[in-house]
Amino acid sequence: MSVLIVTGTGTEVGKTVVTAALAALAADRGTAVAVVKPAQTGVRAGELGDVDLVRDLSGVDDVHELSRYADPLAPVSAARRAGLPTPDLGTVAVAVRRLQADRGLVLVEGAGGLLVRYDHDGSTLADLARTLAAPVLVVTTAGLGTLNATALTLEVMANRGLDLAGIVVGSWPVEPDLAARSNIVDLELLAARPLAGAVPAGAGLLGTGQFLQIARSSLEPALGGAFNAAEFRRRYAV
């Protein structure tokens, strides 16, 4: 897996923290890792963006923000309002392949969900994943409403022939409610596999050393960590 696409079932689901966890684990095992953000929205010039958070949490400096728009909208909408060119996913694919040539892992974090539009032709992160023949890691929420959003994302992936790298809960609550605990089993049924991880809420506020420890316990071995889905299920599921 030299390229991994990280998408979410929506906005503010924990994609950036999960991306940082993946980067931290890769770097810790000695893998040369790069992180690419094709389009950053909702951040003005001079402000810190998602790749800056990834750098701060993971200690990985090889991060690349390819375009930025001030309004917190889909990339195509934010570009239109700013009077700027939309992101070119063909150019993004070239950049990722260039990085891939001498890195062991390239992480590509999308904006919002899988079908958010990047340009006026309707290009999406799903199209980029297909172009790169890269698996997709889906970051989702824990609580009420996650099952429908996750099912829709997985259905789109199946219809487009995209490979699922796993489902990760991006922010597992300190005190999970009934819905969150019940959703563990249902998310695994949707994915037809165990959860690939669950990152504790607040992980994005930790320092680099503590964050690495959390990353290791929050992601499954296939992603570089030591997360045990069966143990997590026994502890929380109802």
Swiss-Prot record:
Keyword check for Ion transport: no
Gene name per UniProt: bioD
Locations listed in the record: Cytoplasm
Cofactor dependence: Mg(2+)
Protein name from the UniProt record: ATP-dependent dethiobiotin synthetase BioD
Pfam families: AAA_26 (PF13500)
Catalytic reactions on record: (7R,8S)-7,8-diammoniononanoate + CO2 + ATP = (4R,5S)-dethiobiotin + ADP + phosphate + 3 H(+)
Residues annotated as catalytic: K37
Self-association state and partner proteins as the record states: Homodimer.
Domain of life: Bacteria
Sequence positions that bind substrate: T41
